[in-house]
C-alpha cells in the first residue's frame, strides 16, 4: 500500500492532474466527503487528507509514504528525514512583508526601530529580519493576518501572497519580497527503500508531467 498525504484546497486541486499522469484517480471529493482516507482507482494507493502544516510530520514519521506540501511549510517544519525529489511547480505564491499603506516601513527600518511583526512563519521571519539586521518582536498568529496591523497589534505582517487582492482590500501594501513558494513532493526515506519500485514510478510520472 502506498499512502499519499495531501491537504484540502488549492494544493489538492492542482495535484489531481499530476496523479492522473501517474494513472491515479482519486474516487472521492475531499470537499464533499467527510472521510479522511480517500480511495483511488489503484487498489494499492490511498490518499490521506490532513492539515497542510501536518503533511511533513505524517511523511517524516511514516504515517504516509509521500506527501505534497508548500516550501513554506517545509521551512517552518524542518525537513529532517524527508527526501525532496521534485519541485512540482504548483500552488505558486510568495512570502512577503506587508504593512498599512500609511506606515513608513522604510524609515522605521532605517532608524533602527524595533518592529512588531505578526506571522505564522516565525522561523522564516526570524531568519529574514536577522539577515537584514532589523530588530523585531514576532507575534505568532494562525490566521486573519491582515487584521493585526489594522487594530494596532503589529506594525507589519509576514504572510503568503498570491494575487495581493486581500492585502489591497484591507489597505495593506507589500514592502518586501522574502521568497517565492511552490509545492514540493516529499518522500519518507525508509519507505523509498522498502517500496522503491512503486514510489519511483510515481516520482517519474510527476517529473514527466511537470516537464511538459
Swiss-Prot record:
Coiled coil: none annotated. GO terms for molecular function: ATP binding; ATP phosphoribosyltransferase activity. Its main location: cytoplasm. It is found in: Cytoplasm. Pathway: Amino-acid biosynthesis; L-histidine biosynthesis; L-histidine from 5-phospho-alpha-D-ribose 1-diphosphate: step 1/9. Its EC number is 2.4.2.17. One of its GO terms (biological process) is L-histidine biosynthetic process. Keywords: Amino-acid biosynthesis, ATP-binding, Cytoplasm, Glycosyltransferase, Histidine biosynthesis, Nucleotide-binding, Transferase. It catalyses: 1-(5-phospho-beta-D-ribosyl)-ATP + diphosphate = 5-phospho-alpha-D-ribose 1-diphosphate + ATP. NCBIfam families: hisG. Heteromultimer composed of HisG and HisZ subunits. Belongs to the ATP phosphoribosyltransferase family. Short subfamily. Lacks the C-terminal regulatory region which is replaced by HisZ. PANTHER family: ATP PHOSPHORIBOSYLTRANSFERASE, ATP PHOSPHORIBOSYLTRANSFERASE ATP-PRTASE. Catalyzes the condensation of ATP and 5-phosphoribose 1-diphosphate to form N'-(5'-phosphoribosyl)-ATP (PR-ATP). Has a crucial role in the pathway because the rate of histidine biosynthesis seems to be controlled primarily by regulation of HisG enzymatic activity. This is ATP phosphoribosyltransferase. The lineage of its organism: Bacteria, Pseudomonadati, Pseudomonadota, Betaproteobacteria, Burkholderiales. The gene is hisG.
